[in-house]
């Protein structure tokens, strides 16, 4: 890293940026996988925790809080239960990270060629929002598979990644791989815009602090992520509820997931049956996960990119990697 002197769009050539972004996604995903499984389980849980009478007809587990859910999954499904969906998730994060960072760099550089340059926060917001939309759309089927695997209990619906792709294609068609995609894009565009704008704004002042192991990047990533995640969380929950729709809906760990159709109608249904709190189920673990995930992602990205630049790894593009 340049000690805050360079912005993300000014660092490294295209191949170095893709490699660093993919590596950052891989490392980040493995570290936070258990929290991601917990978040998905809590988001898919529809019954009231404060009303014991609503639990009478429930056949699956009842999760209460992050630690309790971690213990329950570990007890009932073993240590591997905390990494369910990790294979499609690793593929997702590798592809997503590479596409996201390379798109961010390309869009930022393009915006800087405008006759009237945009203010840095505006440029960062637009670049982050568009890059997030591109990366989300490109990798969405992997995101859906990750959710479905994480939602499985001991009675598996899909035996492997290959089987899941085959079964969804056969029973749901191409549309099945994009259930909830509208909510995902509606969520990720403002999220990544807020995240990158916040990260760029915080990166320079935090980089001037004497922090161990060069953790200024991590600190900026944590703060930016918490702010952005809280703002768009209801759409993340809606996306998860829509991703498990279809013929397998009643076979997941939560067998009482209602039928949902469309983002707007899903939000209305959740508000009607669970109130505003229903849109924020899993927020606590989501924020707990978002902080280390973003910290690890940005720290890994900056340091891997710095290592690649020092090693002159990758092809220099456009006269030394200065352009796109």
From Swiss-Prot:
Described purpose of this protein according to its UniProt entry: Mitochondrial transporter that mediates uptake of thiamine pyrophosphate (ThPP) into mitochondria.
Transmembrane segments: 15-35, 79-99, 125-145, 182-202, 218-238, 282-299
Protein family according to the UniProt entry: Belongs to the mitochondrial carrier (TC 2.A.29) family.
Superkingdom assignment: Eukaryota
Listed GO CC annotations: mitochondrial inner membrane
Keyword Magnesium: no
Alphabetical UniProt keywords: Membrane, Mitochondrion, Mitochondrion inner membrane, Repeat, Transmembrane, Transmembrane helix, Transport
Membrane topology according to the record: Multi-pass membrane protein
Pfam families given in the database record: Mito_carr
Compartments reported by the entry: Mitochondrion inner membrane
UniProt main location, coarse: mitochondrion
GO biological process, one term: transmembrane transport
Protein name: Mitochondrial thiamine pyrophosphate carrier 1
Renumbered ranges of Solcar repeats: 12-110, 119-205, 212-307
């Amino acid at each position: 890293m340049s000690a805050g002197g360079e912005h993300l769009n000014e660092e490294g050539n295209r191949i170095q940026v893709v490699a660093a972004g993919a590596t950052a996604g891989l490392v980040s995903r493995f570290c936070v996988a258990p929290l991601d499984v917990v978040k998905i389980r809590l988001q898919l849980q529809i019954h009231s925790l404060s009303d014991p009478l609503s639990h009478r007809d429930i056949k699956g587990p009842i999760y209460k809080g992050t630690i309790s859910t971690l213990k329950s999954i570990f007890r009932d499904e073993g240590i591997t239960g905390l990494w369910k969906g990790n294979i499609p998730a690793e593929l997702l994060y590798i592809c997503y990270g590479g596409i996201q960072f390379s798109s961010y760099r390309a869009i930022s550089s393009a915006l800087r060629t405008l006759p009237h340059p945009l203010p840095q926060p505006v440029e960062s917001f637009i670049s982050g929002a568009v890059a997030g939309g591109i990366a989300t759309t490109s990798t969405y089927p992997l995101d859906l598979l990750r959710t479905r695997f994480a939602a499985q209990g001991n009675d598996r619906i899909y035996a492997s990644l290959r089987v899941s792709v085959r079964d969804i294609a056969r029973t749901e068609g191409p549309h099945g791989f994009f259930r909830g995609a509208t909510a995902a894009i509606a969520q990720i565009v403002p999220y990544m815009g807020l995240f990158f704008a916040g990260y760029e704004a915080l990166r320079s002042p935090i980089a001037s602090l004497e922090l161990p192991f060069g953790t200024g990047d991590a600190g900026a990533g944590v703060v930016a992520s918490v702010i952005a995640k809280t703002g768009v969380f209801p759409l993340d929950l809606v996306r998860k509820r829509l991703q498990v729709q279809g013929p397998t809906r009643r076979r997941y760990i939560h067998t009482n997931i209602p039928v949902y159709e469309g983002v707007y109608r899903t939000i209305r249904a959740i508000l009607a049956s669970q109130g505003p709190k229903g849109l924020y189920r899993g927020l606590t673990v989501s924020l707990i996960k978002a902080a280390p995930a973003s910290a690890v992602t940005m720290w890994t990205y900056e340091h891997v990119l710095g290592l690649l630049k020092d090693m002159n790894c990758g092809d220099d593009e456009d006269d030394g990697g200065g352009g796109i």
